[in-house]
């Protein structure tokens, strides 16, 4: 759990539950654990690295100098690169599933438009996708036994990708309540950790039994928990995924086919929510959905919690948060804080080069340099990067209780009830983390997609104020700086107290909020990286009010 100065800290920024120290090296027995039936697996595992080599001839002298500089400062950061291994799996027969929705069938549904012309009912390329659905017996698992549940896989038959999902109906009025897609970050962390550790209907106790969660987000919404990208959680593939844009089309296909199978949900308001690296995912996924004018997805808003969206702005706030300017005592001494100040200029210069080119050759060294120079000093203290108030517990993920979740989901009876097809569940897959970093995805400017979203839907950026890794200072700063049509009015808006309004704790201050036009920012008091985990009551309070339209036009 300690950082070596010669390692690349790729697990350091933006995982909902990724370990704060992750050495870049080949997993033991990696080749042995690959799925032997994939003939092109060896090639696919090294795809991001091969793509980097293909671009070698395009290197300018300046970029070559940057790589030389990073190699000299952090000698060993690029040693022993290995890309993701496939997960062992056994596909269940079609007879196991209650429904199989063929994308090719949906693709071939034509309707007549207002001009009397024939057009497809929904847009997008769906012919390669199928959706498998199984009704989950809640009584067999003891999780929200009175709530209808479905689980299954989205299959991309063309690219051998299989994404697992688990759907819970609203506890309140599923016929009218909104539907929410929840995404954890990483990249490479399962959204089932969000389900059982944060905002789902149950947590898992020491006895590996479900414990009812009265603050679950399915109190007033139906929720889909999705394991993506592939090879995360119960999802699997013989190939690797290494960039956010590739996952966006998968998510669009899943939602389109799901709402086709269950049209009773398709007319209801739909929202996408997530945290951490979902600051990359959500702008991309929402943009993909909105790009299809003919769709059955009634997208109304997005919510990003403690996200990484604009690294150029957000990395500036690691020193202030670690050194006592974020509302909590300093974790680092003055000498270390000054060294972080000295490194900031070079870091921002590298990130700007990444923004300008969006090439892996500029984005990868920016990630290496900035993570080592600005996150490394904090990590070496052993303090929890997801909560400045706590030490990192004796766990690879800083929270020992997460082991209960993995133990529960690895039980044969649970996997059978859910229709899981892999041989084991892991909360986070750090090979995926490497893939995304070496594709350059980590530092790319996903905030540039947000102005387009704001033209059509409301956007909420919320942040627990005790988080270091995607802290509230940086999230407030990038939303303040964002160039969009309502920028001036938003920038002039002051933070106001956020209080509980509708229960016995009415009047209790839970944070601060500023909102103008379609953009809203919230600071949540006492919340770490995972606000629903640290502040469940406050989490459900702001979530219900946001879904209810309080801060939206």
From Swiss-Prot:
Q: Where in the cell is it found?
A: Vacuole
What role does this protein play?
A: Vacuolar carboxypeptidase involved in degradation of small peptides. Digests preferentially peptides containing an aliphatic or hydrophobic residue in P1' position, as well as methionine, leucine or phenylalanine in P1 position of ester substrate.
**Chief location category:** other
Q: To which protein family does this belong?
A: Belongs to the peptidase S10 family.
Q: Which reaction does it catalyse?
A: Release of a C-terminal amino acid with broad specificity
A GO CC term attached to the entry: fungal-type vacuole
Attached carbohydrates are found at 220, 518
Q: What is this protein called?
A: Carboxypeptidase Y homolog A
Family annotation (Pfam families): Carbpep_Y_N, Peptidase_S10
- Supply the alphabetized keyword list: Carboxypeptidase, Disulfide bond, Glycoprotein, Hydrolase, Protease, Signal, Vacuole, Zymogen
Q: Give the signal peptide range.
A: 1-17
Gene name linked to the record: cpyA
Active site as annotated: 276, 467, 529
Disulfide pairs here are 189-428, 323-337, 347-370, 354-363, 392-398
Instruction: Name a biological process GO annotation.
Output: proteolysis
Q: Name the EC number(s).
A: 3.4.16.5
Keyword tRNA processing present in the record's keywords: the answer is: no
- Report a single Gene Ontology molecular function: serine-type carboxypeptidase activity
Q: Which domain of life is it from?
A: Eukaryota
Question: Does the record carry Plastid as a key word?
Answer: no
Q: Which residues form the propeptide?
A: 18-134
